[in-house]
Amino acid sequence: MIRVAINGFGRVGRNVLRALYETGQNKQIQIVAINELAEPEGVAHLLKYDTAHGRFRFPVVLDNQQLVVAGDHITLLQQENIRDLPWAQLDIDVVLECTGVNNERVHGEQHIAQGAKKVLFSQPCGPDVDATIIMGINEESLKASDSIVSAGSCTTNCIVPVIQVLDEAFSVSSGTITTIHSSMHDQQVIDAYHPDLRRTRAASQSIIPVDTKLARGIERVLPKFAGKFEAIAVRVPTINVSAMDLSVTLDAKVTIDDVNQALKTVKNGRLNGILDFTEEPLVSVDFNHDAHSCIVDGTQTRVSHKQLVKLLVWCDNEWGFSNRMIDIVLVMNTLSLGNTGK
């Protein structure tokens, strides 16, 4: 049993726990502790009831300072400082760092200093972490000695597998991406102050451009594309599921059928469970609670002058990414058991 602690029980933290129980992987991964500054009553309530993902179908109760999920007791902590977390006492194998604010190697080192064996960040980190892992792309590069790891971002997990498939099949020269992302917690319900002036505006009333470092994230995982991709992002008034508008220039000449066939082929092969492909006339809500990292909408594939390709790629930016966090924990544990690091 892998002993895991979650630091920060927000959208990703809660969905990781939900996914563990819904998929039965709680038999392999035990959530031992949750560190969340919110009151325990709120922690339990938001685990049980979720606007995007519905009611949690497993029983949840509070027992003093413990959250009891389907009979499993989870210690609740409310520590602001990583240095106050009792990871050694709790014998934690992996900390899932899901606060959204701790994204530097030093934060991972603090968790390890407290007794955790490994740390997995739920967001992009700097190049000084031991590894950034995108499932289906580079998990085989992970070593047992890698103790501070990033799972990248939901958008990196969505777009990188598609780029990789296109590059292997047709050789990608360059590209641009527009992320069409659901609203997030750092936006305002009504107009209110924020350092980013665009994010001072009501999330439900506008399409809001925001900064993104997606292009740099692609380079970190696929270094051959350094300087060859650019990206912009907008937030739209939905609460979950996002889309990626990908345009790439290929070295090969292709048709729409060529592109779609290449993507169809891998969905049942090495990217099974990571990349999916659909030609049904679906809308964003149809992908809610979809565990794939990316779903290519083949009805929207376009080709111009045989070498410029445009794709629409969907993802449940919460559920898909949370499932990839679990996948990486399992890979980390397998490596630790095999002690294959160098």
UniProtKB/Swiss-Prot annotation:
Site (Activates thiol group during catalysis): H181
CDD domains for the chain: GAPDH_C_E4PDH, GAPDH_N_E4PDH
GO BP field: pyridoxal phosphate biosynthetic process; pyridoxine biosynthetic process
Subcellular location: Cytoplasm
GO molecular function: erythrose-4-phosphate dehydrogenase activity; NAD binding
Enzyme class label: oxidoreductase
Main location: cytoplasm
Pathway annotation: Cofactor biosynthesis; pyridoxine 5'-phosphate biosynthesis; pyridoxine 5'-phosphate from D-erythrose 4-phosphate: step 1/5
Active site: C154 (nucleophile)
InterPro entries linked: E4P_DH_bac (IPR006422), GlycerAld/Erythrose_P_DH (IPR020831), GlycerAld_3-P_DH_cat (IPR020829), GlycerAld_3-P_DH_NAD(P)-bd (IPR020828), NAD(P)-bd_dom_sf (IPR036291)
Reactions the enzyme catalyzes: D-erythrose 4-phosphate + NAD(+) + H2O = 4-phospho-D-erythronate + NADH + 2 H(+)
Cross-referenced SUPFAM superfamilies: Glyceraldehyde-3-phosphate dehydrogenase-like, C-terminal domain, NAD(P)-binding Rossmann-fold domains
Subunit details: Homotetramer.
Family of the protein in this entry: Belongs to the glyceraldehyde-3-phosphate dehydrogenase family. Epd subfamily.
Protein name: D-erythrose-4-phosphate dehydrogenase
Organism, scientific name: Pseudoalteromonas atlantica (strain T6c / ATCC BAA-1087)
Source species taxonomy: Bacteria, Pseudomonadati, Pseudomonadota, Gammaproteobacteria, Alteromonadales
